[in-house]
Amino acid sequence: IQNDDSGKGLVESLEKALGSGSLAKGDVQTYEPADPSLDTQVTNLASTNPDVVVVAATALKCGQALNAINKLGLKPKVLYISQVCSSPRLMGLVEDQAAITGVLSTTYLMPPYDPQFASDPDQLAYMEGMAKYASSVDYKNDGLYGYGWTMGAILVKTLDAAPELTRSSVMATARNLDNVDAGVVLPGVSFATAGAEDPFPIESLTMMTYDGAAKHFTLLGDLIDFEGKTTTVATRIAG
């Protein structure tokens, strides 16, 4: 994990979900953004012979972590990467694509390359908008653009719903979203918040697995609904 508040919050939440004392010394390896590689961290992690490895890195560190795992021959039963690592562009930086086939992650967005959503009205609107305003980027293959599109869409809907365009009014509206559909969220997913009691707008997602040959992820199974449950494990909430 990255050595910052986000990384620490993830570890705290994971340990809370698994149970106190579930993560022993050496189970958690941190890195600094300026670290040239993650070989040392992965070597330390390999010494614990883990069955499950969670890579909660960002940007180029995602590929560095997976390259180090492959190079050192670490073969956990489950290898999970955070959503921010699941961009095909970042996964494409891994040298041995076959070795990362089967890597797991999660999403709440429709993959832009998935044919089952090709005729979805929201997906079509995304494709049309990106073709018009950002045709030079790889929006048909990289879900990170869909994420940006979706965040913009929910912002617009929040601003439209706010009684006044003031900070307090917009924040109050954002903290009381009533199952708002926006962007390219998966069917069945919506933005819902309930003030301080439940400030998490998205609490449904699905698992997905990486296909090294196709260089993209494939969705697995149905949505997993955590509505109202995230607060039981989350330890750091932005104000």
Where are the regions a protein language model picked out?
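Extracellular/periplasmic periplasmic-binding protein-like sensory domains
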Residues: 69-149, 236-238
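Short hydrophobic alpha-helix segments
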Residues: 28-29, 221-223
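Catalytic-loop motifs flanking and including active-site residues across diverse enzymes
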Residues: 10, 58-61, 147-151, 203
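Sec-exported extracytoplasmic/periplasmic mature domains
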Residues: 15-23, 43-50, 67-74, 95, ...
